[in-house]
Amino acid sequence: MSRYRGPRLRIVRRLGDLPGLTRKSARRAYPPGQHGQNRKKRSEYAIRLEEKQKLRFNYGLTEKQLLRYVRKARRVTGSTGQVLLQLLEMRLDNTVFRLGIAPTIPAARQLVNHGHVTVNGRVVNIASYQCRPGEVIAVRDRAQSRKLVEANLQYPGLANLPSHLEFDKNKLVGKVNSVIEREWVALQVNELLVVEYYSRQA
């Protein structure tokens, strides 16, 4: 299944607020489509599926990529759900988004893919790169890159910088101080239901 490129507000209406996908809010509080206002009781499977979809759309992943992250999280000691969120939050595209360099994760991915971001002084154009504590994330020192990011900083996606990051707006340089804590994950999601969804596949 490929990465979603359709109308973003349609997804927000179905799944709720997805801060990584779009800054816009849905005007209508019910899902899209002819039967959007139906109030049928949902099955447990449908609830788990919805939580999984929140992760997939918020972080802009394909089904295969998300399954790979779940399998990776299972191999790490600790809560699988929490490790899964940490893996997704520490991706380079998400880190760029959380630093305020880009208004959304898709916009951050584009900055990374086009070579506007450096890690420890070297250009990294892989959005899935896992950022580690101690690494310095910066905007590439060239006019085009700085102009793009300075425009983005006028309208940051999220107001608060998470505690594991620091950012110098004048130098356009950020640093990863630690792995993100669960309380700083902006997406409202029940990660345990996501793990349950994949329990027979991962």
From Swiss-Prot:
SUPFAM superfamilies: Alpha-L RNA-binding motif. It comes from the Bacteria. Residues 90-152 form the S4 RNA-binding domain. One of its GO terms (molecular function) is rRNA binding. Residues 22-43 are annotated as: Disordered. Keywords: Ribonucleoprotein, Ribosomal protein, RNA-binding, rRNA-binding. GO terms for biological process: ribosomal small subunit biogenesis; translation. InterPro entries: Ribosomal_uS4, Ribosomal_uS4_bac-type, Ribosomal_uS4_CS, Ribosomal_uS4_N, S4_RNA-bd, S4_RNA-bd_sf. Pfam families: Ribosomal_S4 (PF00163), S4 (PF01479). One of its GO terms (cellular component) is small ribosomal subunit. Belongs to the universal ribosomal protein uS4 family. Part of the 30S ribosomal subunit. Contacts protein S5. The interaction surface between S4 and S5 is involved in control of translational fidelity. One of the primary rRNA binding proteins, it binds directly to 16S rRNA where it nucleates assembly of the body of the 30S subunit. With S5 and S12 plays an important role in translational accuracy. NCBIfam families: PRK05327.1, rpsD_bact. This is Small ribosomal subunit protein uS4. The gene is rpsD.
